[in-house]
Amino acid sequence: MAKKVVGFIKLQIPAGGANPAPPVGPALGQKGVNIMEFCKQFNAKTQSQAGTIIPVVITVFSDKSFTFITKTPPAAVLLIKEAGLQKGSGEPNKNKVGTVSKEQVRKIAELKMPDLNAVDVEGAMQMVMGTARSMGIVVED
């Protein structure tokens, strides 16, 4: 018989940096998941991407076991890395803080394609360009 799903937990954790401290510990503790076991598995799976924030969806079952799926890093994190910035603009409509090229946007869109709800790369690029616009990053042709 299949295990019964008790719930899903969505977190954004730095790759290779999961530890029992908040936010990971309390979120997993509420569902009764073995926190250290998750931390070991997550860190082992993401150690090659160290420093990047990785979204993860943890599926918790009735017997307290779990599985997890890692997603691609958020578009905002990838844009900041491509533009060489510390953070986005506080007033994106007034202050532009950086620029990225269409090629850089295409690269990010292709990387994000599995997680985006887009039919083709052009649609994914539009989503990434919208994120850039909301962060005060100018997209150049």
UniProtKB/Swiss-Prot annotation:
Gene Ontology CC entries for this record: cytosolic large ribosomal subunit
Full protein name: Large ribosomal subunit protein uL11
GO MF terms, alphabetically ordered: large ribosomal subunit rRNA binding; structural constituent of ribosome
Organism whose genome encodes this protein: Prosthecochloris aestuarii (strain DSM 271 / SK 413)
Entry similarity comment: Belongs to the universal ribosomal protein uL11 family.
InterPro entries noted in UniProt: Ribosomal_uL11, Ribosomal_uL11_bac-typ, Ribosomal_uL11_C, Ribosomal_uL11_C_sf, Ribosomal_uL11_N, Ribosomal_uL11_N_sf
SUPFAM superfamilies: Ribosomal L11/L12e N-terminal domain (SSF54747), Ribosomal protein L11, C-terminal domain (SSF46906)
Purpose: Forms part of the ribosomal stalk which helps the ribosome interact with GTP-bound translation factors.
Record text on subunit structure and interactions: Part of the ribosomal stalk of the 50S ribosomal subunit. Interacts with L10 and the large rRNA to form the base of the stalk. L10 forms an elongated spine to which L12 dimers bind in a sequential fashion forming a multimeric L10(L12)X complex.
PTM entry text: One or more lysine residues are methylated.
Domain of life: Bacteria
Any single Pfam family the record assigns to this protein: Ribosomal_L11_N
